């Protein structure tokens, strides 16, 4: 596989994470670079690991996973999106910063990890498909992880601008973005099979 093809795969696999990061940045309100790096590391590590896991699973049972991966991504992203919307509606009078500060640190980590996992299901599917090609999965996974890391930093910081415009409703916007990403994954799969 050529370096250009590998880079294009990395960019394509990181677009869902980029969209989710915009929502996360909006929910944080005024994220600092440190916040963006924290989110980017979690997304980057998970996005690096999932193609490797997919590749390993592809060695064993590729068609079983490919039949339902889109439903897993849709369910996780949709559920997280609904959760964010409900929280945004409950905390109507609070600022985004207040909301971010009151969340438990472990809860934030788990939410980030679940979001990263949901957006990386497609990378796992890529890993499965690459199990049948003569490629070095470590290089492809590293490129996907680095692209995701970079795009998530930009996404979180772009979410800062979005958060300024939407104010207290930023968490709702983030939830809507996650639902759109999950629905897009499901739609793309169903439209390709129908």
From Swiss-Prot:
InterPro entries: Mntp/YtaF, Put_MntP. It comes from the Bacteria. Disulfide bonds: none annotated. GO terms for cellular component: plasma membrane. The keyword Cell membrane applies. It is found in: Cell inner membrane. Its main location: membrane. The chain crosses the membrane at residues 3-23, 37-57, 65-85, 112-132, 137-157, 170-190. HAMAP family: MntP_pump (MF_01521). PANTHER family: MANGANESE EFFLUX PUMP MNTP-RELATED (PTHR35529:SF1). This is Putative manganese efflux pump MntP. It comes from Xylella fastidiosa (strain Temecula1 / ATCC 700964). The lineage of its organism: Bacteria, Pseudomonadati, Pseudomonadota, Gammaproteobacteria, Lysobacterales.
């Amino acid at each position: 596989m050529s370096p250009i093809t590998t880079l294009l795969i990395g960019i394509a696999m990181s677009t869902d994470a980029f969209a989710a990061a915009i929502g996360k940045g909006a929910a944080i309100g005024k994220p600092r670079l440190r916040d963006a790096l924290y989110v980017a590391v979690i997304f980057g590590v998970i996005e690096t690991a999932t193609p490797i896991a997919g590749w390993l699973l592809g060695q064993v049972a590729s068609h079983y996973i490919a039949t339902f991966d889109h439903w897993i991504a849709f369910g996780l992203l949709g559920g997280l999106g609904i959760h964010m919307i409900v929280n945004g509606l409950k905390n109507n009078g609070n600022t985004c910063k207040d909301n971010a500060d009151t969340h438990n640190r472990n809860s934030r980590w788990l939410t980030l990890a679940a979001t990263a996992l949901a957006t990386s299901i497609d990378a796992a599917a890529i890993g499965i498909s690459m199990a049948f090609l003569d490629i070095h999965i470590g290089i492809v996974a590293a490129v996907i992880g680095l692209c995701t890391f970079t795009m998530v930093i930009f996404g979180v910081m772009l979410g800062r601008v979005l958060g300024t415009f939407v104010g207290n409703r930023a968490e709702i916007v983030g939830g809507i973005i996650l639902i759109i990403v999950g629905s897009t994954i499901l739609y793309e799969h169903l439209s390709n099979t129908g």
